């Protein structure tokens, strides 16, 4: 929660673009994104693919290393 600051967020039912900064000191942290449960998703951080875990339909879990101090996270429908 309080270790991540969202500078900008653009969301639709099927996608999310999130500009964020991480201020914590943990070795890793997790971001959850909730989108339409009818689709399968992929994610990119600063244009590079990142691994996701779909906790349940539409709930996208992205775990990043603590050395990732921010960037642009994009989650969109897998093509």
Tell me what each language-model feature is:
Residues 1-27:
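Surface beta-strand/loop "capping" patches
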Residues 15-19, 28-30, 59, 72-74:
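Intrinsic-disorder/low-complexity, polar/charged segments enriched in Ser/Thr/Lys/Arg/Asp/Glu/Gln
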Residues 44-48:
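Short strand-turn-strand beta-turns centered on an Asx-Gly dipeptide
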Residues 54-79:
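C-terminal beta-strand-rich structural cap/linker in extracellular carbohydrate-active enzymes
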């Amino acid at each position: 929660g309080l270790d991540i600051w969202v500078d900008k967020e653009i969301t639709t039912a099927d996608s999310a673009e999130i500009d964020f900064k991480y201020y914590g000191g943990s070795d890793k942290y997790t971001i959850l994104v909730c989108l339409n449960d009818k689709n399968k998703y992929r994610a990119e951080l600063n244009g590079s693919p990142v691994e996701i875990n779909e906790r349940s339909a539409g709930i996208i879990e992205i775990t990043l290393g603590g050395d990732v101090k921010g960037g642009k996270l994009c989650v969109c429908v897998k093509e």
